[in-house]
Amino acid sequence: MAAAAEGVPATRREEPPRDDAAVETAEEAKEPAEADINELCRDMFSKMATYLTGELTATSEDYKLLENMNKLTSLKYLEMKDIAINISRNLKDLNQKYAGLQPYLDQINVIEEQVAALEQAAYKLDAYSKKLEAKYKKLEKR
């Protein structure tokens, strides 16, 4: 009250009104009964075992699928190997046949060159004969 005596008005602190509906009450945590804990543990272990069994089964099935895919791939590669061997064998046969035909192909090339040379000679002979004929006709007219 000394402040009031000095001329400063005394302020009174007002507290906010309490709303009892907004206040939560805490309940004491109770330990579940021993039988409930045992039942929950059994249930948890059972469900965990089911889950792990499912996971292991799925993984096992994945590995079986992968093994089957590897076997099929191996068979496909063996088929491709056989095909490649057959192609190689056929190619060797064709190369041998081509080597056997090579002398005849060389002869054909030589004959083709000779025919071209003979054709050129025939054109020259034809041109020469035309010139000769023109000269003969010219001399005949005189």
Swiss-Prot record:
Expression triggers: Overexpressed in injured nerves.
Annotated positions of the N-acetylalanine modification: A2
Alphabetical GO biological process terms: anterograde axonal transport; anterograde synaptic vesicle transport; endosomal transport; extrinsic apoptotic signaling pathway via death domain receptors; lysosome localization; mitochondrial outer membrane permeabilization; neuron projection development; positive regulation of cell population proliferation
Localization annotation: Cytoplasm, Cytoskeleton, Microtubule organizing center, Centrosome; Lysosome membrane
Tissue specificity remark: Widely expressed. Highly expressed in most brain regions, spinal cord, kidney and ovary. In the brain, expressed in the frontal cortex and the superior thalamic radiation, with the strongest expression in the granule cells of hippocampal CA1, CA3 and dentate gyrus regions. In the spinal cord, mainly expressed in the gray matter. Expression level is high in laminae I-II and V-VI small sensory neurons in the dorsal horn, as well as in the large motor neurons of the ventral horn.
Matching Pfam families: BLOC1_2
An annotated Gene Ontology molecular function: gamma-tubulin binding
Coiled-coil portions: 79-127
Regions of compositional bias (Basic and acidic residues) in chain numbering: 11-33
Keywords: Acetylation, Coiled coil, Cytoplasm, Cytoskeleton, Lysosome, Membrane
GO CC field: axon cytoplasm; BLOC-1 complex; BORC complex; centrosome; cytosol; gamma-tubulin complex; lysosomal membrane; mitochondrion
Disordered: annotated span: 1-33
Known partners and oligomeric status: Component of the biogenesis of lysosome-related organelles complex 1 (BLOC-1) composed of BLOC1S1, BLOC1S2, BLOC1S3, BLOC1S4, BLOC1S5, BLOC1S6, DTNBP1/BLOC1S7 and SNAPIN/BLOC1S8. Octamer composed of one copy each BLOC1S1, BLOC1S2, BLOC1S3, BLOC1S4, BLOC1S5, BLOC1S6, DTNBP1/BLOC1S7 and SNAPIN/BLOC1S8. Interacts directly with BLOC1S1, BLOC1S3, BLOC1S4, BLOC1S5 and SNAPIN. The BLOC-1 complex associates with the AP-3 protein complex and membrane protein cargos. Component of the BLOC-one-related complex (BORC) which is composed of BLOC1S1, BLOC1S2, BORCS5, BORCS6, BORCS7, BORCS8, KXD1 and SNAPIN.
Its biological purpose: Component of the BLOC-1 complex, a complex that is required for normal biogenesis of lysosome-related organelles (LRO), such as platelet dense granules and melanosomes. In concert with the AP-3 complex, the BLOC-1 complex is required to target membrane protein cargos into vesicles assembled at cell bodies for delivery into neurites and nerve terminals. The BLOC-1 complex, in association with SNARE proteins, is also proposed to be involved in neurite extension. As part of the BORC complex may play a role in lysosomes movement and localization at the cell periphery.
Name assigned to this protein: Biogenesis of lysosome-related organelles complex-1 subunit 2
Species annotation: Rattus norvegicus (Rat)
Gene name in the database record: Bloc1s2
